[in-house]
Amino acid sequence: MIDAIARVRRFNRAVTTEVGALDTSFLGRDRPLGAARVLNLIGHGQGDVAAIRATLDLDSGLMSRLLRGLEEEGLVATDPHPDDARRRIARLTQAGRREFKAYERLSDAQATTILGRCVRRDDVLAAMDLLATVLGQARITVEETDPRGPAARHCLG
């Protein structure tokens, strides 16, 4: 069992190093990965702040700090939700759309570089697919929920 644990930890270290997860300037854009992930979700149409928080499994304090930082940079603006003023909807500003596109280009380039170093590319991609599926399944729960709530909206896209 210790060997399995050591292998998982080795894998975790390799991935976090490879993708720059611990860099203070993720992909050289002067913000950490957490803020970049929030920007990414908003850029892909996930504006409900509670749903973003649920998707990234962030506590409310960290979510607020990340969102406030993006707002202070002029990349994101928030508005009250039209159906519930206690909730907020985030959207990219014009500068935020440019930054989102820059991250998309840099992320694609990073993926291209990683794949370019792989001799057994198809095997690596199959392993990545398997891991993404297995790790995603581990987060699935079956429970009754408000169909208008952030968890339901996240599942229904």
Segments the model singles out, each with a brief description of its role:
Residues 52, 75, 147-155:
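Short, solvent-exposed linear motifs at loop/edge-of-secondary-structure regions
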Residues 2-5, 9, 57, 97, ...:
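Short amphipathic alpha-helical segments with heptad-repeat character
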Residues 68-125:
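Charged, amphipathic alpha-helical coiled-coil/dimerization segments
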Residues 55, 87, 137-139:
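Short, solvent-exposed beta-strand edge segments and adjacent coil->beta transition regions
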Residues 1-33, 142, 150-156:
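N-terminal leader segment of winged-helix/HTH proteins
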Residues 21-62, 67, 73-75:
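N-terminal helix-turn-helix DNA-binding core of bacterial DNA-binding proteins
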Residues 8, 101, 105-150:
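Terminal interaction helix/tail motif
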